[in-house]
């Protein structure tokens, strides 16, 4: 597994890798208050659906330790503003709500315990959520490894890598496992405008792991697909819903259509924590809109005229008809089969 971690727990403190600075600097943010973690989620210091789910769990643990509640019931009540603050950080990724639901269920089921014991349970649950994610990603990688044939070329989008998760990544997990097994393959990484997660993060982490990776502008993908230079695509997901529609980084939909047009398989790596069976179709997924400055500047340098109007959706929805298969820690499924999955609680 790559040495660099998106988030870690040391000496009763959460440390978050500030991914805004990659690849130029590797710096960790020291977080001793839940608001610091919430801010890091909002400003993309930490990003990737599984990683922000883990960060949410750690935020709840940090908050609970700082509260001076006299009973478990009082602790639960005092945590309600924390839950709401975290839910409001980023609306599209389901993992934040998933982590909060899990923490709330733990607390509700143990309100009879002394508050000190409940706080210990909350901390241990955060550790468990973090460790589980690493194992889930590895299992996704083991299933997806079947698609990695000797000499293949795979295209990926945004960053569904180790730095978007607790470790291994979702879409990148089979890449790390293929590398370990000595399978020769190439990765094409789309730069992923406007925040350039593919260029800054995916290219960075794959190069660091010694994986053969080539960076392209997003609008080069179609040309490579038409020339037959890509064997398959694999991407992550921030929320996959009951009918198999997939919300992921803006531009994923475009790539899926190009793959369909050129008869190239399009796979989605989805931990069950990112699957939301309460929503029937992608049309109902809330889509986050972010600051115009992400589009009009790159690393603080203006690239557009002052006052230009901007549309900046952070995510788009890929309809199930463009998805060849969804790879979870429970196996590989057709999009139409997702509604039958028993999800991880």
Curated annotation (Swiss-Prot):
GO terms for biological process: L-methionine salvage from methylthioadenosine. Its EC number is 5.3.1.23. It comes from the Bacteria. Keywords: Amino-acid biosynthesis, Isomerase, Methionine biosynthesis. The record marks 158 as: Transition state stabilizer. Catalyzes the interconversion of methylthioribose-1-phosphate (MTR-1-P) into methylthioribulose-1-phosphate (MTRu-1-P). This is Methylthioribose-1-phosphate isomerase.
């Amino acid at each position: 597994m790559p040495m660099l971690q998106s988030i870690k727990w040391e000496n009763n403190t959460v440390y978050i890798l500030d991914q805004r600075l990659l690849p130029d600097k590797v710096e960790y943010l020291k977080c001793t208050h839940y608001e610091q973690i919430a801010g890091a989620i909002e400003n993309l210091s930490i990003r990737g659906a599984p990683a922000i789910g883990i960060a949410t769990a750690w935020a709840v643990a940090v908050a609970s330790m700082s509260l001076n509640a006299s009973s478990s019931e009082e602790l639960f009540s005092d945590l309600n503003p924390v839950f709401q603050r975290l839910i409001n950080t980023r609306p599209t990724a389901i993992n934040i709500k998933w982590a909060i639901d899990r923490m709330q269920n733990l607390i509700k089921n143990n309100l009879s315990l002394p508050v000190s014991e409940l706080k210990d349970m909350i901390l241990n649950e955060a550790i468990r959520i973090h460790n589980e994610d690493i194992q889930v990603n590895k299992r996704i990688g083991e299933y997806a490894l079947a698609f990695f044939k000797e000499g293949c070329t795979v295209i990926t989008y945004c960053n569904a890598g180790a730095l978007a998760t607790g470790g291994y990544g979702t879409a990148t997990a089979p890449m790390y496992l293929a590398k370990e097994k000595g399978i020769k393959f190439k990765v094409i990484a789309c730069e992923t405008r406007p925040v350039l997660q593919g260029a800054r993060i995916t290219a960075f982490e794959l190069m660091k792991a010694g994986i053969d990776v080539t960076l392209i502008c997003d609008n080069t993908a179609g040309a490579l697909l038409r020339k037959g230079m890509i064997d398959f695509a694999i991407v992550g997901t921030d929320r996959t819903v009951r009918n198999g529609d997939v919300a992921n980084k803006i531009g994923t939909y475009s790539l899926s259509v190009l793959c369909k047009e050129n008869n190239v398989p399009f796979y989605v790596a989805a931990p069950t924590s990112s699957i939301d069976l309460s929503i029937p179709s992608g049309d109902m997924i809330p889509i986050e809109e972010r600051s115009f400055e992400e589009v009009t500047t790159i690393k603080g340098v203006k690239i557009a005229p002052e006052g230009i109007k901007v549309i900046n959706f952070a995510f788009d929805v890929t309809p199930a008809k463009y998805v060849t298969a969804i790879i979870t820690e429970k196996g590989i499924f057709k999009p139409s089969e997702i509604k039958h999955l028993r999800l991880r609680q």
